[in-house]
Amino acid sequence: MEPAADSSSSLQTFQTEVTEDSFGKFILTCNIARIRGEPSNVYTGLNIGCRLPECPPENPFEIYYLMKDSELQENNDWIRLYLELAVATTDRNREASDFGLSNLEIVNVAVDAEGLLNAKNAIFYIRYKDLYEARLGNAVFDRIAIVRRIFDEDTGRFTLVGQNQSSDIIN
């Protein structure tokens, strides 16, 4: 944290929280940090817009914007975070040591949003290979993580909602 321009001011402590709204479902919310002690008028109930995204009837990788390799490299940190959160929060049957999150290989990403990658509200279709599952001999290792990103400027609430599905749903 950088000190304020006025050298007489002290450092401020900010507070925020990230919550998992439902065990085993990828519904994570984070309220924007505010100075500790300031009143909060943030709505705490589950927003109707937070329903789990579903795969459209058409192949999302053919109808929505397909990220270029250079865009994937440039935005890999947060795309990868979305993918890892989707896998870790929806597959609770794996032991923590078995998650193999490093064994998730992103194949391609489609974006459904106005403003594309910089949109505050968007749905990301992340096709990936679960190389951990492939090594176990499981047939379903080509998967899709569907992640909805929602940012409400009025409340300062940031929400990620998502799920994993077999890529067979689009073939």
Curated annotation (Swiss-Prot):
Pfam families: protein_MS5
Lineage: superkingdom: Eukaryota
Recorded family membership: Belongs to the UPF0725 (EMB2204) family.
Listed NCBIfam families: A_thl_para_3677 (TIGR01572)
Protein name as catalogued: UPF0725 protein At3g25080
Protein species of origin: Arabidopsis thaliana
